[in-house]
Amino acid sequence: MLNVTKLIDSIPLNFKKDLEFISKQIHDLGKESFLIGGSVRDLILGKKPHEYDLTTSMLPEEIKKKFKRVIETGIQHGTVTIMLGDNAYEITTYRKDIDYTDGRRPDKIEFGASLSEDMKRRDFTMNAIALDLITERLIDENHGIEDIEKRLIRTIGNPLDRFGEDGLRPIRAIRFQSTLDFTIEPETYNAIYQTRHITEKISRERFHDELNKVLTSNNPFIGLIELHKNKIFELFTKVNFHSNPSDVDLQSLGKLAVAPLGLRLAYLLNWLLPKKDLLIQAEQILKDFRYSKANTKDALFYLDLFLCNYKAEAMNSIETRKFLSKVVAY
């Protein structure tokens, strides 16, 4: 059984003081405040989170009146950010989400929900554990701790419903598989492919952000394999990929602990695309996936290196000099 006091004491001191201050201010008004989401999950895993989100029974306007520096981060969804020194803490009012028709966000939200109702709208059991820093209560109605101990990613309730609400959630499941080295529970996994028509509705910018988190994780190999296997890449570009690429080249990506993003992208594109017109197709994908000009330049440079490695024996002296001058110029 988890020792809640030790869990709270494991929070780095600068964050702990801030979080306890916020929680006490809210509790003194007779309201509720809980630490929730990825920070609680990571604390249970023995990690040191750098971001902390809270949920509360207070309304956004009440929070704005209580705290001196508050930013209206997403006030239409009940979220504001409390600033304490240089630290920022997102705090969201308990809410119920009413209907999802665009596969991206709720059509309507209702405040006045209970903590229990609020947790039911969240994505995965491991992210729906609430920690009260004042009373040292740990609320886990969806068996998230058990799933964390089993290293399982499982949706709250029916995965088709959860993924149907927000098309980013299937990609987040794959991302967590890479970043946490967890396994996706079978029913949840099967729903990833079944809800591709919902995932297709999310913006390319949101996909870009999740792909970056996979690429820069400790184990990008498994996440990239799953994105390809579930045909997620194809939802955001019309470029044709290898139908069955070899995994050998991609496996080495996981060994590049400090590789820059451009090199990681080059490994991905070199794996996904046939060698014919590789650079042209790669540039189009990077544009479709909303990568910056700098990221694109880096990735294409590394891809050019890969191509020259493939055809090195066939290069004549003029081609070799051209390539070397390109490397020097870069």
Segments and roles (model prediction):
Residues M1-Y330:
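Catalytic cores of the polymerase beta-like nucleotidyltransferase superfamily
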